[in-house]
Amino acid sequence: YEAALVSNDVAVLDELFRNDRRTLRYGIGENLYGYDAITAFRAARSPVGLNRRTDKTTITTFGRDTAVASTLFYRESMPGRVGRQMQTWIRCPEGWRIVAAHVSIIDEPKGPAT
């Protein structure tokens, strides 16, 4: 996913989201409901400035067919801020797919991480 994201490989990103009207993605400035809305967003998104550094990536599994991927990310274009990303993945007949995603950016917390 990460390689496809930073290189703006729209075909791979589209494939990794579940093709279902119930799939959703809450982005930094948009709420996308359904696979069609997510793919339309990806098709229109600028490929500029997507590089980032990830940190504290955690994969939490629930049985063999459900996982949540959580990570922090940093971009040179947003000093003093930290991005947060969570994705719920399920194992489908065609492979692992994202069914829910959330991306947000906050001011970098001061002090030790908790």
Short names for language-model regions:
Residues 82-112:
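Short beta-strand edge/turn micro-motifs at domain boundaries
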